[in-house]
A protein has these predicted regions:
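Acidic, Mg2+-coordinating phosphoryl-transfer loop and its flanking beta/alpha structural elements
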Residues: 172-212
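Substrate-recognition element of Asp-dependent hydrolases with the DxDx(T/V) motif
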Residues: 98-129, 139-147
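Extended hydrophobic secondary-structure segments that form protein cores and membrane-embedded regions
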Residues: 6, 42-44, 140-142, 169-175
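N-terminal helical cap/lid subdomain that shapes the substrate entry/recognition surface
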Residues: 2-8, 12-100
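Conserved Lys-Pro-Asp/Glu-containing loop-to-beta segment of HAD-superfamily phosphomonoesterases
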Residues: 152-180, 184
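A short, structured active-site edge motif that brings together acidic residues
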Residues: 40, 69-74, 134-148
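Short acidic-hydrophobic, aromatic-tinged amphipathic segments that line or gate anion-handling sites
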Residues: 141, 209-216
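Short amphipathic alpha-helix with an adjacent loop that forms part of the alpha/beta core around
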Residues: 217-229
Length: 231
C-alpha cells in the first residue's frame, strides 16, 4: 500500500494574482483595522495559517492569539473565500490535471490519499470543492491547533497508520520551498509541482522530481514511484 499526501494551495488549486492570500490579509484588516504586513509567506517562522495569524497579532498587539479569536477570524475568512468564488469563479482553478489525477489515485486499490495543508481544514475544503476535487473522499489535515507543517504532516501520517500499519512508499506532493524543507526534515519522499514551469526553484533546493502539472498522468505516477527525500 502506498500513501500519497498532497498539499493544497499551489499544488492542487491556484488563484489569480494570489487572490486567496490577499483574502487572508483583507480579513485581518477588516477585523483589526490595521494593515496586514505582507503576503510574502517566507517572512514568517512557519507557513501555516495559525502561525501567520499568531505572528501578526503578536507584532501588532503584543499578545497571544486566543482560540475564540482564531475561530472568529476563520469564519470571516471563509465567508470572503466563498464570496470571491461566487463573484469571480474563474479566478480560482485547479492546477492543470489535478482533479483528474486525484480521481485516478483514489481509484487505485493499492493507494491511500490524504491532504496535509498549511491552511485550516475548512478553508481547504472550500478551495478543493470549488474546482471539483472530492475533498470528502479523504482525510484533510490542516493548521487547526498546529503551528508547523511538520506537525500537520505528522497528524496525517498518524491517521494513515491507523488504517494501514505499513506502507511500501509514502510521498508528499507540494509546490513551495517550505515543502522541500519540511520533507527533508522528515526524510519523506517528495514530488514537486511548479505550475508556472519554473521547476528549478525546487530543484535548486534539493528536490529530485519536479513536474509542472498533472496533465501527463503516467509521468506523474512514474515520478511518485521514483520519488526520494530532497537532498
Amino acid at each position: 500500500m502506498k500513501l500519497l499526501i498532497f498539499d493544497v494551495d499551489g499544488t492542487l488549486v491556484q488563484s489569480v494574482e494570489r487572490a486567496d492570500s490577499k483574502c487572508f490579509a483583507a480579513t485581518y484588516e477588516t477585523i483589526y483595522g490595521k494593515p496586514f504586513p505582507t503576503i510574502d509567506w517566507h517572512q514568517f517562522p512557519h507557513v501555516t495559517d495559525t502561525t501567520i495569524l499568531q505572528t501578526v497579532i503578536q507584532d501588532h498587539f503584543g499578545r497571544a492569539l486566543s482560540e475564540s479569536e482564531k475561530h472568529a477570524f476563520e469564519q470571516k475568512y471563509m465567508e470572503l473565500l466563498r464570496y470571491n468564488r461566487r463573484k469571480q469563479p474563474h479566478h480560482f482553478s485547479e492546477v492543470a490535471g489535478a482533479r483528474a489525477m486525484i480521481h485516478r489515485v483514489l481509484s487505485m486499490p493499492d493507494t491511500l490519499v490524504a491532504i496535509a495543508t498549511g491552511g485550516w481544514r475548512k478553508t481547504a475544503h472550500i478551495k478543493m470543492q470549488h474546482v471539483g476535487i472530492p475533498s470528502q473522499a479523504f482525510w484533510v489535515s490542516g493548521a487547526d491547533g498546529k503551528t508547523t507543517r511538520e506537525a500537520i504532516i505528522e497528524e496525517s501520517l498518524e491517521i494513515a497508520h491507523r488504517i494501514e500499519q505499513r506502507f511500501s512508499k509514502i510521498v508528499y506532493i507540494g509546490d513551495a520551498p517550505w515543502d522541500v524543507k519540511t520533507t527533508r526534515n522528515m526524510q519523506l519522499d517528495f514530488v514537486g509541482i511548479r505550475r508556472r514551469g519554473d521547476r528549478e526553484v525546487l530543484a535548486e533546493l534539493g528536490a529530485t522530481h519536479v513536474l509542472q502539472d498533472y496533465l501527463d498522468q503516467e509521468v506523474f505516477l512514474e515520478a511518485l514511484q521514483a520519488a526520494e527525500p530532497p537532498k
